[in-house]
Amino acid sequence: MKIAVLMDAPLRATLLSEKTMARLAEWGEVAVNETDKAEKETVKQIIAGADIAITSWGVPQLDKEILDCAPNLRFVAHAAGSVKGIVSDELYARGIRVVSSARILSYGVSETALGLTICACKNVFAFNEEIRNGGWVEDYSVITELFDITVGVVGCGFAGSHYIELLQAFGVNVLAYDPLLDEAAIAAMGAKKADLDTLLAESDVVSLHAPAPVSYTHLRAHETVLDLV
Protein backbone atom coordinates (compact mmCIF):
# COMPACT_ATOMS: atom_id res chain seq x y z
CA MET A 1 0.00 0.00 0.00
CA LYS A 2 1.25 3.48 -0.87
CA ILE A 3 0.48 6.55 1.24
CA ALA A 4 1.05 9.94 -0.40
CA VAL A 5 1.62 12.89 1.96
CA LEU A 6 0.91 15.84 -0.31
CA MET A 7 1.29 18.96 1.82
CA ASP A 8 4.51 20.98 1.54
CA ALA A 9 7.52 20.04 3.65
CA PRO A 10 7.32 22.90 6.21
CA LEU A 11 3.64 22.21 6.86
CA ARG A 12 4.25 18.48 7.11
CA ALA A 13 6.89 19.10 9.78
CA THR A 14 4.34 21.14 11.73
CA LEU A 15 1.41 18.74 11.43
CA LEU A 16 2.96 15.28 11.39
CA SER A 17 5.46 14.31 14.06
CA GLU A 18 8.26 11.82 13.49
CA LYS A 19 6.25 9.33 15.53
CA THR A 20 3.24 9.80 13.26
CA MET A 21 5.36 9.39 10.14
CA ALA A 22 6.83 6.20 11.59
CA ARG A 23 3.34 4.85 12.23
CA LEU A 24 2.37 5.60 8.63
CA ALA A 25 5.45 3.71 7.45
CA GLU A 26 4.17 0.64 9.30
CA TRP A 27 1.16 0.64 7.00
CA GLY A 28 3.06 0.83 3.75
CA GLU A 29 5.29 2.89 1.48
CA VAL A 30 5.16 6.60 2.32
CA ALA A 31 5.85 9.21 -0.36
CA VAL A 32 6.26 12.81 0.81
CA ASN A 33 6.48 16.26 -0.72
CA GLU A 34 9.99 17.57 -0.08
CA THR A 35 9.33 20.99 -1.62
CA ASP A 36 8.13 24.24 -0.06
CA LYS A 37 4.90 24.26 -2.07
CA ALA A 38 2.27 21.73 -3.08
CA GLU A 39 2.35 22.53 -6.78
CA LYS A 40 0.08 20.50 -9.04
CA GLU A 41 2.89 18.80 -10.95
CA THR A 42 4.60 17.87 -7.70
CA VAL A 43 1.36 16.46 -6.32
CA LYS A 44 0.87 14.37 -9.47
CA GLN A 45 4.29 12.81 -9.03
CA ILE A 46 3.83 12.02 -5.34
CA ILE A 47 0.29 10.66 -5.62
CA ALA A 48 1.13 8.36 -8.55
CA GLY A 49 0.05 4.84 -7.65
CA ALA A 50 -1.12 5.81 -4.16
CA ASP A 51 -3.92 4.08 -2.26
CA ILE A 52 -4.22 6.81 0.40
CA ALA A 53 -3.55 10.56 0.20
CA ILE A 54 -3.01 12.92 3.12
CA THR A 55 -3.75 16.55 2.28
CA SER A 56 -3.88 19.88 4.09
CA TRP A 57 -3.82 23.62 3.44
CA GLY A 58 -2.24 24.55 0.13
CA VAL A 59 -2.85 21.26 -1.66
CA PRO A 60 -4.58 21.83 -5.01
CA GLN A 61 -7.97 20.39 -5.87
CA LEU A 62 -7.81 16.67 -6.55
CA ASP A 63 -9.25 16.90 -10.05
CA LYS A 64 -9.34 14.32 -12.85
CA GLU A 65 -5.81 15.14 -13.98
CA ILE A 66 -4.40 14.37 -10.54
CA LEU A 67 -6.69 11.41 -9.84
CA ASP A 68 -5.77 9.75 -13.12
CA CYS A 69 -2.27 9.40 -11.65
CA ALA A 70 -3.69 7.33 -8.79
CA PRO A 71 -6.31 4.91 -10.16
CA ASN A 72 -6.18 2.87 -6.94
CA LEU A 73 -6.80 5.84 -4.62
CA ARG A 74 -9.54 4.96 -2.13
CA PHE A 75 -9.09 7.29 0.84
CA VAL A 76 -8.21 10.96 1.40
CA ALA A 77 -7.42 12.23 4.90
CA HIS A 78 -7.51 16.04 5.01
CA ALA A 79 -5.37 17.36 7.88
CA ALA A 80 -7.31 20.63 8.02
CA GLY A 81 -10.90 21.82 8.33
CA SER A 82 -13.07 22.36 5.27
CA VAL A 83 -12.48 20.02 2.32
CA LYS A 84 -13.95 22.47 -0.20
CA GLY A 85 -10.53 23.33 -1.57
CA ILE A 86 -9.51 19.77 -2.42
CA VAL A 87 -12.66 17.87 -3.38
CA SER A 88 -13.97 17.68 -6.93
CA ASP A 89 -16.90 16.04 -8.69
CA GLU A 90 -14.45 13.51 -10.09
CA LEU A 91 -13.31 12.58 -6.60
CA TYR A 92 -16.87 11.79 -5.51
CA ALA A 93 -17.68 10.06 -8.80
CA ARG A 94 -14.90 7.58 -8.10
CA GLY A 95 -16.32 6.76 -4.68
CA ILE A 96 -13.21 7.91 -2.83
CA ARG A 97 -13.85 8.37 0.87
CA VAL A 98 -12.83 11.76 2.34
CA VAL A 99 -12.40 12.65 6.01
CA SER A 100 -11.15 15.84 7.66
CA SER A 101 -9.96 17.23 10.98
CA ALA A 102 -12.77 19.78 11.17
CA ARG A 103 -14.29 18.52 14.41
CA ILE A 104 -10.97 18.23 16.25
CA LEU A 105 -9.83 21.67 15.06
CA SER A 106 -13.15 23.16 16.13
CA TYR A 107 -12.38 22.47 19.78
CA GLY A 108 -9.39 24.81 19.69
CA VAL A 109 -11.38 27.41 17.75
CA SER A 110 -14.24 27.42 20.25
CA GLU A 111 -11.88 27.47 23.24
CA THR A 112 -10.09 30.46 21.73
CA ALA A 113 -13.45 32.15 21.11
CA LEU A 114 -14.37 31.64 24.76
CA GLY A 115 -11.02 33.05 25.87
CA LEU A 116 -11.50 36.10 23.66
CA THR A 117 -15.04 36.50 24.98
CA ILE A 118 -13.76 36.63 28.55
CA CYS A 119 -10.96 39.03 27.59
CA ALA A 120 -13.43 41.29 25.79
CA CYS A 121 -15.87 41.29 28.71
CA LYS A 122 -13.04 42.14 31.12
CA ASN A 123 -11.71 44.78 28.70
CA VAL A 124 -8.31 43.11 28.99
CA PHE A 125 -6.98 44.52 25.74
CA ALA A 126 -7.71 48.16 26.62
CA PHE A 127 -6.41 47.73 30.17
CA ASN A 128 -3.23 46.12 28.87
CA GLU A 129 -2.61 49.03 26.52
CA GLU A 130 -3.30 51.52 29.32
CA ILE A 131 -0.84 49.82 31.68
CA ARG A 132 1.83 49.52 28.98
CA ASN A 133 1.57 53.28 28.55
CA GLY A 134 2.00 53.89 32.27
CA GLY A 135 -1.65 54.40 33.14
CA TRP A 136 -4.11 52.71 35.45
CA VAL A 137 -7.88 52.37 35.09
CA GLU A 138 -10.07 52.62 38.19
CA ASP A 139 -13.40 52.67 36.35
CA TYR A 140 -14.67 49.13 36.79
CA SER A 141 -17.93 49.99 35.04
CA VAL A 142 -16.18 49.09 31.78
CA ILE A 143 -15.95 45.45 32.92
CA THR A 144 -18.72 42.97 32.16
CA GLU A 145 -18.98 39.70 34.02
CA LEU A 146 -19.69 36.56 32.02
CA PHE A 147 -22.73 36.05 34.24
CA ASP A 148 -26.40 36.99 33.91
CA ILE A 149 -25.91 38.33 30.39
CA THR A 150 -27.02 37.11 26.97
CA VAL A 151 -24.51 35.61 24.56
CA GLY A 152 -25.52 35.28 20.93
CA VAL A 153 -23.97 32.58 18.77
CA VAL A 154 -24.24 32.88 14.99
CA GLY A 155 -23.62 29.51 13.38
CA CYS A 156 -23.91 26.22 15.28
CA GLY A 157 -21.53 23.97 13.41
CA PHE A 158 -18.65 22.14 15.08
CA ALA A 159 -17.08 25.29 16.58
CA GLY A 160 -20.31 27.12 17.39
CA SER A 161 -21.90 24.12 19.10
CA HIS A 162 -18.79 23.44 21.21
CA TYR A 163 -18.65 27.14 22.15
CA ILE A 164 -22.25 26.80 23.40
CA GLU A 165 -21.24 23.71 25.36
CA LEU A 166 -18.39 25.62 27.02
CA LEU A 167 -20.74 28.46 27.94
CA GLN A 168 -22.82 26.07 30.04
CA ALA A 169 -20.23 26.49 32.82
CA PHE A 170 -21.24 30.16 33.11
CA GLY A 171 -24.53 31.67 34.23
CA VAL A 172 -25.43 33.14 30.86
CA ASN A 173 -28.42 33.01 28.56
CA VAL A 174 -27.47 31.72 25.11
CA LEU A 175 -29.31 32.64 21.91
CA ALA A 176 -28.36 30.87 18.70
CA TYR A 177 -28.99 31.57 15.04
CA ASP A 178 -28.51 28.85 12.45
CA PRO A 179 -30.94 28.51 9.53
CA LEU A 180 -30.03 24.84 9.11
CA LEU A 181 -31.07 23.72 12.60
CA ASP A 182 -34.49 23.59 14.22
CA GLU A 183 -35.46 24.73 17.71
CA ALA A 184 -35.11 21.24 19.23
CA ALA A 185 -31.59 20.72 17.90
CA ILE A 186 -30.43 24.07 19.25
CA ALA A 187 -32.16 23.47 22.59
CA ALA A 188 -30.26 20.19 22.90
CA MET A 189 -27.04 22.19 22.68
CA GLY A 190 -28.12 24.39 25.57
CA ALA A 191 -29.31 27.46 23.66
CA LYS A 192 -32.53 29.08 22.49
CA LYS A 193 -33.13 29.48 18.76
CA ALA A 194 -33.57 33.08 17.62
CA ASP A 195 -33.72 34.92 14.33
CA LEU A 196 -30.71 37.07 13.51
CA ASP A 197 -32.37 40.41 14.25
CA THR A 198 -33.56 39.26 17.67
CA LEU A 199 -30.19 37.77 18.53
CA LEU A 200 -28.32 40.94 17.62
CA ALA A 201 -30.81 43.15 19.46
CA GLU A 202 -30.84 41.16 22.70
CA SER A 203 -27.26 39.89 23.01
CA ASP A 204 -24.60 41.55 25.14
CA VAL A 205 -21.94 39.47 23.39
CA VAL A 206 -22.07 38.04 19.87
CA SER A 207 -19.75 35.26 18.72
CA LEU A 208 -19.66 34.63 14.97
CA HIS A 209 -19.10 31.03 13.88
CA ALA A 210 -20.84 31.25 10.52
CA PRO A 211 -19.27 29.58 7.47
CA ALA A 212 -19.28 31.30 4.10
CA PRO A 213 -21.97 29.68 1.94
CA VAL A 214 -24.59 31.78 0.18
CA SER A 215 -27.00 31.43 3.11
CA TYR A 216 -24.72 33.55 5.27
CA THR A 217 -23.47 36.19 2.84
CA HIS A 218 -26.12 38.67 4.01
CA LEU A 219 -24.28 38.88 7.35
CA ARG A 220 -21.53 40.92 5.73
CA ALA A 221 -23.93 43.72 4.91
CA HIS A 222 -26.16 43.47 7.96
CA GLU A 223 -26.32 46.95 9.48
CA THR A 224 -26.43 45.69 13.07
CA VAL A 225 -23.32 43.57 12.57
CA LEU A 226 -21.50 46.57 11.15
CA ASP A 227 -22.59 48.62 14.16
CA LEU A 228 -20.95 46.06 16.46
CA VAL A 229 -17.54 46.35 14.79
Describe each region flagged by the PLM:
Residues 192-195:
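Short acidic-hydrophobic, aromatic-tinged amphipathic segments that line or gate anion-handling sites
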